[in-house]
Amino acid sequence: MSWKERLDNPTLSVWPHDYLRPHAEPFVEQGTYSISIPQLSGDYATLLAAWTALLYRVTGDDDIVLYVRDNKVLRFTITPELTFTQLQNKINEQLAELANVEGTNFDALSESLQKESGLERPPQLFRIACVTEDLQLDRYTHSPLDIGLQLHESSSDVSIVFNKLLFSQDRITILADQLTLFLTSVLQNAKQVFTKVSLITDSSTSILPDPKANLDWCGFVGCIHDIFQDNAEKFPERTCVVETPPINSTKTRTFTYKDINEASNIVAHYLINTGIKRGDVVMIYSSRGVDLMVCVMGVLKAGATFSVIDPAYPPARQTIYLGVAKPKGLIVIRAAGQLDQLVEDYITKELDLVSRIPSIAIQDNGTVEGGSLPSESGDVLASYTELKSTRTGVVVGPDSNPTLSFTSGSEGIPKGVLGRHFSLAYYFSWMAKQFNLSENDKFTMLSGIAHDPIQRDMFTPLFLGAQLYVPTQDDIGTPGRLAEWMGKYGCTVTHLTPAMGQLLTAQAVTPFPKLHHAFFVGDILTKRDCLRLQTLAENCCIVNMYGTTETQRAVSYFEVTSRSQDPHFLKKLKDVMPAGRGMKNVQLLVVNRNDRTQVCGVGEIGEIYVRAGGLAEGYRGLPDLNKEKFVNNWFVEEGHWNYLDKDLEAPWKEFWQGPRDRLYRTGDLGRYLPNGDCECCGRADDQVKIRGFRIELGEIDTNISQHPLVRENITLVRNNLEGEKCLVTYMVPRFDKPELENFKIEVPSNISDDPVVCGLIGYSPFTKDLKAFLKKRLASYAIPSLIIVLPKLPLNPNGKVDKPKLQFPTVKQLELVAKNSSIDINDSEFNQQEREIRDLWLECLPTKPTSISPEDSFFDLGGHSILATKMIFTVKKQLNVELPLGTIFKYPTIKAFAAEVSRLKSTDKIEEETTALTADYASDAASLIDTLPKSYPAARALGSPSEMAGPTTVNIFVTGVTGFLGSFILSDILNRTVTGVNFKIFAHVRAADETSGLDRIRKAGTVYGTWKEEYANSLQVVIGDLSKKNFGLTDDKWSHLSETIDIIIHNGALVHWVYPYSKLRNANVVSTINIMNLASEGKPKLFNFVSSTSVLDTNHYFELSDKLQQSGKEGIPESDDLMGSSLGLTSGYGQSKWAAEHIIRAAGKRGLRGSIIRPGYVTGASYNGSSNTDDFLLRFLKSAVQLGKIPDINNTVNMVPVDQVARVVVAASINPPCGDDLCVVHVNAHPRIIFKDYLYELKNYGYDVEIENYEQWKKTLEEAVIERSEDNALFPLLHMVLGDLEDSTKAPELDDKNAITSLRADIEWTNEDRTKGMGATPEQIGIYISFLESVGFLPHPKHFGDKALPNIKISEQQKELVASGAGARSSSAA
């Protein structure tokens, strides 16, 4: 392997550093820190292994790239479960391989790569080193090192050589201690898993949070509404709220503490007297202003829980919030307008309101009106005015719920977070002291009115006795106006989201020097955001507060000093502000992802948990999610703090659950800085995959924000017009910069009202410049496919970027762009072959890009996998070259694709991948066998029901349950009613949480007509990543699974007929090994694998089948060792199933028991045809109707109804046919049908189809699809059907004695004999056609045929779902 191949697209790991990377000379200032490690004794390989371990721990990068001794570069993949010994062995293997490779001049290599790839500058190849010779960080101009180790081989001394412009001395000192600590530990015990060795040094113990510390669990300071009432009685005439006037008015509305207190007392007494009880939810339909504060205080004084609906939300969305909240009371603020009729209807039908204030408004004189109800005359609040000075006397405690706030949830359903009174007031005294807040401050009401930060806006001044200023909507929404408002009214403290901060500074010129603190919440805060704000507010300290709705007021903080105090403070910081450290009695615990009993050391990436007494109570109505996200602190024993309140006597004691040491699992990744602050490193789930590449959205946005003409930006994953995922950046440029005019062209006046079209056309030169800018910083696959320039980013009512409004452009918009754009092409960039390919691509692409270069990818230019099929055929026809469809996936850029076309034309043959690939899958399987356990606990079959003693629960772990076959497997199991036996399914699902996982199962079952709601009682959803060790589950969850499960059915797979083995390996092979590992631990388990007859698709088995048939035998025996296809399989899918089977057989020799079940084509349900419409055979039916022709192919088809396949799978899993062995179970059709006869059944039911010679049929199809661009269901599969379908549809005959054995034993479990099997009779095909016609997949027959379509039963809901495309998912098995 050449150095170019070794260093293709390397991961440039970034060791956490303290200072911004310099962008001008000098780039490097070398520093050295030396330590002595006597135990090391000059052992370079051990030091390299330790350095690699630390690199993985601090970056999380599994692609390790290190500059090593002898002027070489080491590159390999690391996994977190390795012991240190295994890591050493892996590195020794790599070093041994490198020993035979000559070093090179890496600057020359960078320059060569630059030239080959047309890059603007030579690429950097590595950043981190471990050597034995003298280390110079700047040895290579194009690959300067950030940090490295130098081992002095003649001694035990090690030097850390580092760039002092990046790393602080404190960090290097801690790193030296961590290296010493790690080596000391692993040299004493090399069998430790390297990710579980503690990195907390003695020197860092004092700066990191102690997870066992007492965080004042019993420190309740009282309820915010009581504190407010006390303040109102102390200083009743002090100004409380100021509503500033709109632009066309001079009328300011000012309200005192007495006004607010009395008005809210009236509201509270009304609520209580109309039936609101302690803990009831009262929903407020609100506007921004004093009325909201009155309503909130009134609800709290009544002992109830307030929640807010913003009228800016669509009515349908409002009903969703109401459905989650289930309020007992409703208050409509007059200024918010009337409820939409849709909302009123929902309230009438779905809610049980006991109290309603129809139109509340506080008057200028402080009196309050509530409006009148239809059933009553007069104002609803009028009779309660006499109670305006009377407290309600309702007692609530620290664990009562004052707030219900919403946060995003799965399937578009928000989650309601119940707050606690403990948190609302606890932190204000500390904040006042820490940030110099007082009764003299003027706060602002800028947060979204339905967003939980609005609580800070209101409660902070009420606690302090300060003032709250309220702007108009015009003040907020007009660029530049909000800054004027801040300056005019002398506001001193504000709470903002970063998006609202950008709105405050956008086009602003008016300074507001009286602002001394701005608290930011809700999103990442960048240096750019801070600089813009402090340019206008030089006396403003900026506080970045990290927390979530679920942590309530319990947050961390990082303070940015004001410009007037330290003009250079921001210059020293990196681009994203750190989260900082916890406020009073709040901890950010960064927990080791591989051993949650450990807090991470400085620099180490882990998952952030928030520990505090002020966490929210949890999610309303979601107990399972609460268990997952709000967890008891495992660092102390449960009940450890109970002694603290044993003598507590308080009137609110009954509303107090006692000291609870809980953690909130944020899902964010973070690391500690050398001073103990914490910085966020992205989401544990914020990485997306597009075309197989792992992409970090935050990294893309950070790089885009560094372009000098970018003001705001956000990158999202969006589905393009064909439903494929792509990256789209939405961006607001620096309109105030004159240089922007150089990157702008005129937009036709007839389309100037569409901002998306205007942005795509008018700023196309700018987006081209930005893409060129990104090519220097990002891998090609991470560059957004589309960059859309907008005048501003839309904000939701909460002040955050409104992501749902940022969508992929419509067909009409893209057509307008294409019609009014010229393509910017520099012809000199392309060679002759590249020009040909470029022009052919442009013919195929649905919309023309504004610019194109040799490095552009087909997919980034707007192509997709279906379009790729058409493009490949066009290239084959026009350039007369034989081209496999997979070429475009392997060579996606114009440059690479053209080079491959040139190679094929010159050699006149397709690249001989088959031998390499076939060798790969067999040898890869052999190597993976070495990773298996030496033995598996021997499981025994359940036996017959009559043999089972007493009531028994059979626990079955099933994968692929949301797929076609998986839905039927699930229903087959749960439909069994055997006395004394209960089945429980542990269903693996990919989802955000268990609730959304169950929703996915329910929806899939509904689509395929199998779901019954009672199934939910017998289901346990398992959320995990099958490609990771232990599915990425915690040790506790994994242990519970391994000790509980009796039977495993691994049915999940990635089915793709184009992807090569390498792309399917993780999903179909590695995942299988990880699931087998479940069988190796805990209780003995039967392991059952749903494979595919595609493992038999070689000439060997076709010939063997013919030979066996001629001698009177059934077909390929189930006992065959499958070595006849160890070479020769041509589909990546078949290869991946073969590899998995081969590994499972090896495990069987080590004690694994169970079955390998091999279905062929899995077709619709026998009784009503319910089908997965994205199916080869069903597409062929539709294509035949569209084309009017069917090919004359006489192969038999092994197609079996899905309910029969599911029965065989479950029967073999419960009743393994080979007892104490592991064997194969064939699913064979009885009877089989000839391919053309299957299709010709259409004729019998009134469809116009004729049989045509296969070669003529191919020509007819190609002309229709390629030349006339007619729709055809086979379009995505043209590469297959226009190849050699006569060969590819061959299916060897199969012996299925094992299947019959299991089905016979299964009769006692089901009271049904399925041993005769099922297949494809003409009657069965009629049921399929009837189903497809009823869901709209096939048109209604044009005339009466010889047969009438049979009547079938399917629900209207199923019809709607299938018709909408929900049934067109890939099968879990094929």
Curated annotation (Swiss-Prot):
Family annotation (InterPro entries): AA_adenyl_dom, ACP-like_sf, AMP-bd_C_sf, AMP-binding_CS, AMP-dep_synth/lig_dom, ANL_N_sf, Far_NAD-bd, Lys2
Cofactor note: Binds 1 phosphopantetheine covalently.
Family: Belongs to the ATP-dependent AMP-binding enzyme family.
Protein name (database record): L-2-aminoadipate reductase large subunit
PROSITE patterns: AMP_BINDING (PS00455), CARRIER (PS50075), PHOSPHOPANTETHEINE (PS00012)
Domain Carrier: from-to ranges: 828-905
Cross-referenced Gene3D superfamilies: 3.30.300.30, ACP-like, N-terminal domain of ligase-like, NAD(P)-binding Rossmann-like Domain, Nonribosomal peptide synthetase, condensation domain
